[in-house]
């Protein structure tokens, strides 16, 4: 079920990328190279699942929101891989963007993908102006100096300051955008308030499992096995150990599922969220 659902989400988002970036240029090619690379599209899946809680948006708007969030995610991956950052040559099993297109073009492609996310939301004719403002406020906070960018800076600092809080780093680098995936299709403030802390914990669990897989199975992640070691990178596994990392992630997902089951009344939304959360723990890449 989860593979079919995420494949359907990925197909819709990929088509939106291709249709929106069909004007041929080196920049659009570089943008599509990372955006269309093999991936789980988990964030898009969460957008599609949570959209069913209220069922207030058109299909086009849901696809645009999902694409915007995946665009921000792709931008962050391109910039994270740069020589000045994590200096990774591989991403998703293929050469990183800066290896394929050069460092300068990769930087520009990342910049363009960030702008493209806001362009998608601003240009959506089905979304109300008030909802557009809420979405733009949410995703700009997620990817900005209080979100992913701050998390990346803390991640870089942690190479020389091992006492940095790994949970805070993961919450900023991963949790913030996953929170956006959970709440940007919604309008009800009580539902948003309920889902936000759950979403941030799910983001932490996702990144913990990434840390586990980078330790136990890096090739299946499509990354260089020596990358984190070379960069002296702080991870949940290096700080707490492999066994605690797995146990903590499983407990987070178990608690998240229980909270969702007690609150979410739409069976379709709940079942899809349950399988996505379980997939986070069970995934191998």
Predicted feature locations:
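Generic C-terminal helix-cap and adjacent flexible tail
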Residues: 265, 282-285
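Mg2+-dependent prenyl diphosphate-binding active-site environment of isoprenoid biosynthetic enzymes
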Residues: 18-259, 269-281
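N-terminal amphipathic/basic leader segments beginning at the initiator methionine
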Residues: 1-17, 285
